Amino acid sequence: MPYRKYREKKYETKYREAFKVFQEKIGITFTDEKLLIQAFTHSSYVNEHRKKPHEDNERLEFLGDAVLELTVSQYLFQKYPTMSEGELTKLRAAIVCEPSLVRFANELSFGSLVLLGKGEEMTGGRERPALLADVFEAFIGALYLDQGLETVWEFLKEIVYPKINEGAFSHVMDYKSQLQELIQRDGSGNVEYQILQEKGPAHNREFVSRVTLNNVALGLGSGKSKKEAEQQAAAEALKKLKEQL
């Protein structure tokens, strides 16, 4: 056997073993392992191995992007029943953006599994954020094709959803949503808002709102609308609660 073929065979054996260990790590065994390998195959690797029937991960990335948006959307819709469409959209965008996907990928050492061409390898492709984010989406696409939406949901429940529950994306929420998330996380009870006062002429009204937790006042706020007053009350409540932590 020519040395080049021997080297390539050894390389592929090494990667197949790595994928076996990876599946054991995440507790998922692919029915079609070719899909798993494809999810981690960069176009640069395919370009350098044209004589072999390799397929890159770009189509799986396309599919995974849609599956990820759907599953995260469903989770947020169920978790935050009072959150507005605009706030849900902002929160979802923060969860599926490139830096977040890179974080998820790095937690599972996705970079070490990627099949790269020599040029891409030499220029640091294995650690390139855009590449890692694409691989994470491609993996979701492969998992969906191989085992369906339920398994994708279970995987995200281990890797992604806990970050939401820990408040990793709270910075993109409005004050009311942040307060609601904090209270839910601690299991402290129910938050309620009450308009205490409306004052001023019709063209220049001012509202005063109070937010309570289990009938205990947490914050007061005022604004030109009920919504603004509630947001300010929530902001004051958040400040107080964070000082106590």
Swiss-Prot record:
Localization per Swiss-Prot or TrEMBL: Cytoplasm
Entry keywords, A to Z: Cytoplasm, Endonuclease, Hydrolase, Magnesium, Metal-binding, mRNA processing, Nuclease, RNA-binding, rRNA processing, rRNA-binding, tRNA processing
Keyword Metal-binding: yes
A single GO cellular-component term on record: cytosol
Keyword Nuclease: yes
Binding positions for Mg(2+) per the UniProt entry: 61, 134, 137
Span of domain RNase III: 19-148
Active site, renumbered: 65, 137
Role description: Digests double-stranded RNA. Involved in the processing of primary rRNA transcript to yield the immediate precursors to the large and small rRNAs (23S and 16S). Processes some mRNAs, and tRNAs when they are encoded in the rRNA operon. Processes pre-crRNA and tracrRNA of type II CRISPR loci if present in the organism.
Name the UniProt record assigns to this protein: Ribonuclease 3
Organism encoding this protein: Bacillus cereus (strain ATCC 14579 / DSM 31 / CCUG 7414 / JCM 2152 / NBRC 15305 / NCIMB 9373 / NCTC 2599 / NRRL B-3711)
